[in-house]
From Swiss-Prot:
Keywords: Carbohydrate metabolism, Cell wall, Glycosidase, Hydrolase, Peptidoglycan-anchor, Polysaccharide degradation, Repeat, Secreted, Signal. Its EC number is 3.2.1.78. The lineage of its organism: Bacteria, Bacillati, Actinomycetota, Actinomycetes, Bifidobacteriales. This is Mannan endo-1,4-beta-mannosidase. GO terms for cellular component: extracellular region.
Length: 1002
């Protein structure tokens, strides 16, 4: 009886949260807090019963409960016979956690996605989630989203984070990505209609600098606000209640939580505290040193999770780089790696819920990727022993038993400024201020109390709009405030009807902005350290690598000129081997008009290895100034001549793919990052010390590099064979070489067009969509001066097409198509430069559909062949390709099968078809049109927001409300409470009809 009454009261309370805002609950059953065993501190208090049960199960993990997971557990594999993945083939079991990347799958770049139809891809991904659940596996989704501002890939680090927030230039574009996530989650159901809980891990490894949401591309404040926006949008606007949200920076933190928490969005938006770390050092025979590092950091993460009532997980791990599993399957060190890691976590961090490794994508050469053992590999037996060591490691019915659902703990009401973002610049005299409330019912808010105050005495009146937002406009002109490079601090104040002021979501709730555009800095001024007001600003620009932010500080310049300098503190005890800091440049900078790099250096005499690193044209170059003295002096590092000859820079020793390359002016025209490292030189040298640097500048002016888009005749380029297939002994060898996209099951060797020659056969039935691709990694091949890509194709007369894509090292893809309206062998020659039939298909930026230029030929990453279903009545294609080569202009016929523009299927994200206005503002809608989520969150079982655990004498989940739950009691008290509910709601009841926001993918 008590349970039923509590549920109905909760329903009444939820129903009283009326009009104009979405799910902002602030209460739990009988006021239970996160510390109470009967409730969980979950980010979504309206989460489905199954989602709360999963949270509880994972949070309460103890010794023996560790689960093993893998990305693409069943749909990528190394062994050709592993139809259900290598893990299943070697162990007879599925991993307990399955992972996919929603960002890639939904745009068709990874399985189960195929093609550009996000609607179809959402259905396919949801079906895979359902299948994983039926196998006894928990599902986690990451999101390698394209850069919404440029349309380029996730590693395009053009800063965009603040423009994705409400009112931002690309908020509408980003919302489409979130809509697809919502569509996937809401379709992921069991056969009885139960929504399957999913762990969603957006914006991962943000403390690195390789993603657009990463360090130096998004400030800590921007990152936190963007993460919160993702959760708010999915949970409150899209009404998705079967997601747990994971936060997962990458290591190493040396057990210190400072940097780990620097971008933590807050407990109201996070459920899983994760950690990503890979072992890439192959010098040791065992993995103990790396495991000790992981354990030290995981203890820190576990402590933080315990304090907050959250889940702890090793969200990504594996062996990569030099330590990766070898393509041959032999010669790997420490094949007991998985058992050793699992045992260390179980013993030292028993609360770890799961550890997930990456996908067995395969491929060949340097691009080979395997993260588990496979059939026939040296580690097969040890991996099977690992899988058999504990039943909880692998999938099972119990693993996905979500019958025991605790209540959601009460959340404290809060208010925060969403825009402008703390630390950002304001360049418009009319500033739109958006304040978001969380954890409080609309009916409890004092709408007339909402204001934002400034530290100059202004009060900005806020008006409630929808989705929990208040908005107002600060008119700087009217306030007499100039855009003069000064600062302005804003503080929100929102009260409830009982006079209480909502707490700040972060710190004291204030945000400080800079007034006016950032002063332009000339390209030759690489770094003078004088533009930073404080160390936090400096540390937001430079990303630590195997160090901590606090080891980069501002000091007085050793040049004694009254200016600032930068000080790098190294600590090889805490961070062994190397410490460093990197600054990325987006867009890339053109340094080609200068011949040297100067800097003022005051070293500590340690004689360690000082590394000055420049990434130019996608290649990492290094120079090594001596630091064996202590006197301050100017260091001058030469770039060499136009071709890089005679310079001080050489490719990094670990970048074997570019060994011997010179730092030419052409490469210097595209500088993507600049970094400073101190490497441990061993011996009796000190384990800690400091370097002070200032006045890092480009010098030695010269004519800048000018691309030659029209090469002169008679260039010295020679024909290059891309692949004649003669070197492959069997199908497996050919599949390995052409495995850069997976999908190798469609490939086999065939007889070539001439006696004794070989070809690559591509036979495919369109079962995974019209576009299905294979690729060979070309490792930055230089095609400069080449005129034609030539190859032979055997047609099948199907009327379909073979699509060819040339991928460059800077992320561009150029597409041409060969229509298979013929049979037998045919010579195809595709002009490479200024060819209207070979045009940029990706990214979908301003250069889309433009032809290749000579400049694009300098570094070729991969060659792609793909099926294109041009004939809808056919059931597949069967074609072969032979003798692929590039040739200079002479002796080429310059003929190409015409491209059928009407049928070309480009593997690109068609959701990027943007109108002129790509912005959106979920805060600016009419309250009457906002989604109203004030009724019970229905989930799969009609659960309310405030359920309690089942009592020991019943097997029914305690959250089965609705008709069945109410009818079982037969008590008159239910009628009485229902009557009270009607009185409480009064005339407002008519307003509780839910209105859903349009734009869902159905």
């Amino acid at each position: 009886m008590k349970t039923t009454v509590t549920k109905l009261l909760a329903t009444v309370a939820a129903a009283s949260t009326i009009f104009g805002m979405s799910t902002l609950p602030a209460f739990a059953a009988e006021g239970k807090s996160a510390s109470n065993g009967n409730s969980v501190n979950i980010s979504d208090v309206n989460a489905t019963a199954e989602t709360r049960a999963l949270f509880d199960k994972l949070k309460n993990s103890g010794k023996g409960d560790l689960r093993f997971g893998q990305q693409h557990a069943t749909d990528e594999n190394i062994s050709s016979s592993a139809s259900q993945g290598d893990v299943y083939e070697t162990t007879g079991k599925y991993p307990a956690v399955f992972g996919w990347d929603a960002g890639l799958a939904l745009r068709g770049a990874e399985k189960p996605g195929s093609g550009a139809d996000k609607n179809a891809n959402a259905k396919a991904l949801a079906q895979n989630i359902t299948d994983a659940d039926s196998k006894g596996a928990i599902v986690t989704l990451s999101a390698h989203w394209c850069n919404p501002g440029t349309g380029k890939d996730f590693n395009d680090t053009t800063a965009v984070a603040s423009e994705l927030l409400p009112g931002g230039k690309y908020s509408g574009t980003f919302n489409k990505e979130l809509d697809a996530i919502a569509a996937t989650a809401q379709r992921a159901k069991r056969s009885d209609g139960t929504l399957i809980p999913i762990i969603f891990r957006p914006l991962h490894e943000n403390n690195g600098s390789w993603f657009w949401w990463g360090a130096t591309h998004a400030s800590a404040s921007e990152y936190k606000e963007l993460y919160r926006y993702i959760v708010d949008y999915l949970r409150d606007v899209k009404d998705v209640h079967n997601l747990l949200y994971a936060y997962s920076p990458g290591g190493v933190f040396n057990g210190d939580s400072t940097d780990y928490l620097a971008t933590y969005p807050g407990d109201q938006w996070v459920d899983v505290l994760g950690y990503d770390e890979y072992d890439s050092d192959d010098s040791a025979d065992d993995s103990s040193a790396w495991i000790n590092t992981v354990v030290k950091d995981m203890k820190m993460v576990s402590d933080q999770a315990s304090q907050r009532g959250k889940i702890v997980a090793l969200t990504e791990f594996g062996r990569s780089g030099d330590r990766k599993f070898k393509e041959s399957g032999t010669g790997d060190k420490d094949t007991k790696f998985f058992s050793e890691l699992a045992e260390a976590l179980a013993e030292n961090v028993p609360s770890t819920a799961y550890m997930m490794t990456w996908a067995n994508f395969g491929g060949g050469g340097d691009n080979f990727q395997a993260y588990t053992s496979w059939k026939g590999s040296d580690g097969e037996a040890d991996f099977k022993a690992f899988a058999d060591s504990n039943k909880n490691l692998m999938a099972s019915k119990d693993n996905v038993d979500y019958s025991n659902a605790p209540a959601a703990a009460m959340q404290n009401g809060s208010a925060r400024i969403v825009t402008p973002v703390d630390g950002n610049r304001v360049t418009d005299t009319k500033v739109v201020v958006r304040v978001k409330t969380e954890g409080v019912k609309y009916s409890d808010l004092d709408l007339n109390s909402a204001i934002v105050t400034t530290d100059r005495g202004q009060n900005v009146k806020l008006k409630y709009s929808c989705n929990g937002y208040f908005t107002g406009i600060l008119d700087l002109n009217a306030a007499g405030i100039n855009l003069d490079q000064s600062k302005l601090t804003l503080t929100p104040q929102v009260k409830t009807k009982d006079g209480k002021t909502l707490a700040a979501a972060d710190g004291n709730g204030s945000v400080t902005v800079k007034l006016g555009a950032k002063p332009e800095q000339t390209v030759d001024n690489v770094e003078d350290f004088d533009s930073y007001d404080n160390e936090a600003e400096l540390q937001s620009v430079y990303s630590p690598s195997h160090s901590t932010k606090s080891n980069l500080t501002l000091v007085d310049s050793p040049e004694d000129n009254g200016t600032k300098a930068g000080n790098i503190h190294y600590d090889f005890v805490s961070y062994p081997e190397y410490n460093g800091f990197q600054r990325s440049h987006t867009p890339k900078q053109d340094w080609s008009g200068f011949s040297k790099l100067n800097m003022f250096l005051k070293a500590d005499g340690s004689d360690h290895k000082f590394v000055v690193q420049v990434n130019a044209g996608g290649v990492t170059f290094e120079a090594y100034p001596k630091i064996d003295g202590t006197d301050g002096h100017v260091v001058s590092l030469n770039f060499g001549d136009a071709d890089g000859n005679g310079g001080d820079f050489a490719p990094a020793s670990w970048d074997t793919a570019h060994a011997g390359m010179k730092l030419s002016q052409k490469l210097l025209s595209k500088v993507g990052s600049f970094a400073l490292y101190i490497n441990d030189n061993g011996g009796n040298r000190p384990k800690s010390g400091d370097l002070t640097l200032d006045s890092i500048k480009l010098d030695g002016k010269r004519d800048a590099y000018a691309p030659n888009t029209n090469p002169t005749p008679g260039n010295t380029a020679k024909a290059q064979s891309v692949d004649d297939f003669s070197g492959y002994s069997d199908d497996a060898a050919a599949q390995s070489a052409w495995g850069n996209r997976g999908h190798t099951e469609v490939l086999s060797l065939d007889e070539g067009p001439t006696d004794g020659s070989k070809a690559l056969r591509f036979k495919y039935d369109f079962s995974n969509g019209g576009w299905y691709d294979v690729a060979k990694y070309l490792d930055g091949a230089n095609w400069s001066g080449e005129s034609v890509l030539a190859f032979q194709v055997k047609g099948d007369g199907s009327g379909n097409a073979i699509g060819l894509q040339i991928g460059t090292s800077d992320g561009k893809y150029f597409l041409a198509s060969v229509k298979l309206d013929f049979t037998g062998w045919k010579q195809i020659e595709i002009p490479l430069v200024d060819n209207a039939n070979l045009t940029q298909s990706w990214p979908e930026d301003a250069n889309k559909d433009n032809p290749m230029t000579e400049d694009d030929l300098a570094s070729i990453k991969e060659l792609v062949f793909a099926s294109q279903q041009w004939n809808s009545e056919s059931d597949g294609l069967d074609s072969s390709i032979a003798d692929i080569k590039v040739e200079p202009a002479e002796n080429t016929s310059n003929e190409q099968t015409p491209k059928d523009e009407s049928k070309t299927e480009v593997k690109a994200d068609k959701e990027q078809e943007q109108s002129e206005d790509t912005s959106a503002d979920v805060t600016a809608q009419d309250p009457a049109t906002c989604p109203i989520s004030d009724e019970d969150s229905k989930g799969s079982t009609g659960n309310t927001t405030v359920t309690v655990k089942p009592t020991p004498d019943t097997k029914e989940p305690a959250d089965n409300t609705g008709k069945d739950g109410l009818s079982r009691t037969g008590s008159n008290i239910i009628s009485a409470i229902a009557a009270v509910a009607v009185l409480l709601l009064g005339g407002c009841a008519v307003l509780i009809a839910r209105k859903r926001k349009g734009g869902d993918i159905e």
